């Protein structure tokens, strides 16, 4: 029994391990991977490995895994990656898993600076990536520092601005909050819709030379072949759509492209190594097939996948609406509960206020009663004193009468009697004056007693009003309410140095509609506004001395009003012959 081969396949978010037989083909391994992760849009993807010479290579599906130039290691390492890119992610990507894999791969390309991304776009994309991971921003769930372990923006962008890590996180948190209500899957798609407008998105670059020996870049992507000057990967100079190409072939390092326009000469360039020409041919065949397929009616399989995706999306929207409804209901109940608690606290405060007022009124009443009793005691004492003085006056009158009678009856010493009489007369006058004063005091005390009695009656009436007022209402009781791209090469022999592929363009509709496209920022006012705001914010912290060569090129393109699609229209102008002549002259 042959010993199985241990294989480790790393996707963008998982590691898968398999044991395969020595006769297992690339397709069998590939099918096992896509089945495991539930992927049906298999035509975009491939298995990549580093060959014995250290070059990244795509696993051939029609050959045995063990017969290819994989390193003899245990386990054998593969990466599951997107090999071909869609023209428009929002129109072509069907499954959520497909969107997620593209999102993670493109994000990694931007963060590692393999795909140039300007600063303001990098921050906006970072906020969408945060939304895709964390969902809606919440002050309770997302405390300060919740982004501290996240890779958010390219290191190049951070180095170019005088902002701390915390300041970058604060900016992204603000934009994260702006995306409230957006589903995680939708955030990934919004990320890709913006990222696909970046100049280097989805392009495979290869070093080539024209017949003059000029060093150039060949860019192979979903739309065709583009030629770049050696010092500028952002701005293609010449473009050939796939619909203009009928045959691609190479012999050793010489690569020949035959246009559909038979009046045009062959498009010839040279690659430094044979294996590069093989990769170019494979990518050309795969991209051309997908380009043609997109311009034909969908197959039954794709129609079924789209119908299923629509149904799943509709179901998710319903679930989202139900969750939102339930969330709003819970929030309403919480608000109602908080309102009742506030009302209860207000009632308790009012009751305490009533109690304090009642106690104060009772104390005032008690004080007034005490004061009234004191006044009554003083009035009684004054009354008794007045009565005593009256008795003394009466006794004095009687004594006077007695003396007068004695004076009449007895004849004694006239002077002595007169002196006694004068003495008693003076005493009577004094007593009379004292009696009048006491009577006046009695009247005053009686007046004050009446006032106290009136205050007492008034206080009793106020207390009675407080005690008989209806109590505040009690707080209410709370009731908690597939198919693969045909990209393998038909070889004449194992050591053959020449390969050729015919590219058919029959039966396609609107073969160059991509030239009518505009960027997401141009058609989406919200994205346009966000990018403008971010650009203004970051310009104040930018260190102009740290601008890279790509920054300078990008800014110059912006200044001249160019973007990815305007450039595409420009580089395809003229007939095929004119553009080939232009390439030869570079």
Curated annotation (Swiss-Prot):
Region: Disordered; residue ranges are: 305-340
Question: Which post-translational modifications are recorded for this protein?
Answer: Phosphorylated by tyrosine-protein kinases. Phosphorylation by ROCK2 suppresses the head-to-tail association of the N-terminal and C-terminal halves resulting in an opened conformation which is capable of actin and membrane-binding. S-nitrosylation is induced by interferon-gamma and oxidatively-modified low-densitity lipoprotein (LDL(ox)) possibly implicating the iNOS-S100A8/9 transnitrosylase complex.
Q: Which residues form a coiled coil?
A: 302-462
Protein encoded by which gene: EZR
Origin organism is Oryctolagus cuniculus (Rabbit)
Q: Which residues carry this modification: N6-acetyllysine?
A: 60
Q: How does it sit in the membrane?
A: Peripheral membrane protein
According to the entry, every stretch annotated as the FERM domain falls at 2-295
Protein name in the entry: Ezrin
- Its signal peptide is none
Mechanisms controlling activity: A head-to-tail association, of the N-terminal and C-terminal halves results in a closed conformation (inactive form) which is incapable of actin or membrane-binding.
Identify the keywords attached in UniProt to this record, alphabetized: Acetylation, Cell membrane, Cell projection, Cell shape, Coiled coil, Cytoplasm, Cytoskeleton, Membrane, Phosphoprotein, S-nitrosylation
């Amino acid at each position: 029994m042959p010993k199985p081969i241990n294989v480790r396949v790393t996707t963008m978010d998982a590691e898968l391990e398999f044991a395969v037989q020595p006769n297992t083909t690339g397709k069998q391994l590939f099918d096992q991977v896509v089945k495991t992760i539930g992927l049906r849009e298999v035509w975009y993807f491939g298995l990549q490995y580093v060959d014995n010479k250290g070059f990244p290579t795509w696993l051939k599906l029609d050959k045995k895994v063990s017969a290819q130039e994989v390193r003899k290691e245990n386990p054998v390492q593969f990466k599951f990656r997107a090999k071909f890119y869609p023209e428009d992610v929002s129109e072509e990507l069907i499954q959520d898993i497909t969107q997620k894999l593209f999102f993670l791969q493109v994000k990694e390309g931007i963060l590692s600076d393999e795909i140039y991304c300007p600063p303001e776009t990098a921050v906006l994309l970072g906020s969408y990536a945060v939304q895709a991971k964390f969902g809606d921003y919440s002050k309770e769930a997302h405390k300060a520092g919740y982004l501290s372990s996240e890779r958010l923006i390219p290191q190049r962008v951070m180095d170019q601005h005088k902002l701390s890590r915390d300041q970058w996180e604060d900016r992204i948190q603000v934009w994260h909050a702006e995306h409230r209500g957006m589903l995680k899957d939708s955030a990934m798609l919004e990320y890709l819709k913006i990222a696909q407008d970046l100049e280097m998105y989805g392009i495979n670059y290869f070093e080539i030379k024209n017949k003059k020996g000029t060093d150039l870049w060949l860019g192979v992507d979903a739309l065709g072949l583009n030629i770049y000057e050696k010092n500028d990967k952002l701005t293609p100079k010449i473009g050939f759509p796939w619909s203009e190409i009928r045959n691609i072939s190479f012999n050793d390092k010489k690569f020949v492209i035959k246009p559909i326009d038979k009046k045009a000469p062959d498009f010839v360039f040279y690659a430094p190594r044979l294996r590069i020409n093989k990769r170019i041919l494979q990518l050309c065949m795969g991209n051309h097939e997908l380009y043609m397929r997109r311009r034909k009616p969908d197959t039954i399989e794709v129609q079924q996948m789209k119908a299923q995706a629509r149904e799943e999306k509709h179901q998710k929207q319903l679930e989202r609406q139900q969750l939102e409804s339930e969330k709003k209901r819970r929030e309403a109940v919480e608000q109602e509960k908080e309102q009742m608690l506030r009302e209860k606290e207000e009632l308790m405060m009012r009751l305490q206020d009533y109690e304090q007022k009642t106690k104060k009124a009772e104390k005032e009443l008690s004080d007034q009663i005490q004061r009234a009793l004191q006044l009554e005691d003083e009035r009684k004492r004054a009354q008794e004193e007045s009565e005593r003085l009256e008795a003394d006056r009466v006794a004095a009158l009687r004594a006077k009468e007695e003396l007068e009678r004695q004076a009449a009856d007895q004849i004694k010493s006239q002077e002595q009697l007169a002196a006694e009489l004068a003495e008693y007369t003076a005493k009577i006058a004094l007593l009379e004056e004292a009696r009048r004063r006491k009577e006046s005091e009695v009247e005053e005390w009686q007046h004050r007693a009446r006032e106290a009695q009136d205050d007492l009656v008034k206080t009793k009436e106020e207390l009675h009003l407080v005690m008989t007022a209806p109590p505040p209402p009690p707080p209410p009781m709370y009731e908690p309410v597939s198919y693969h791209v045909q990209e393998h090469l038909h070889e004449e022999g194992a050591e053959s140095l020449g390969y050729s592929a015919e590219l058919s363009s029959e039966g396609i509709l609107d073969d160059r509609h991509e030239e009518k496209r505009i960027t997401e920022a141009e058609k989406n006012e919200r994205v346009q506004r966000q990018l403008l705001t971010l650009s203004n914010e970051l310009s104040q912290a930018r260190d102009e001395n740290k601008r890279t060569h790509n920054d300078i090129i990008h800014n110059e393109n912006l200044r001249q009003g160019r973007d990815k699609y305007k450039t595409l229209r420009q580089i395809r102008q003229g007939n095929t012959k004119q553009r080939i002549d232009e390439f030869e002259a570079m």
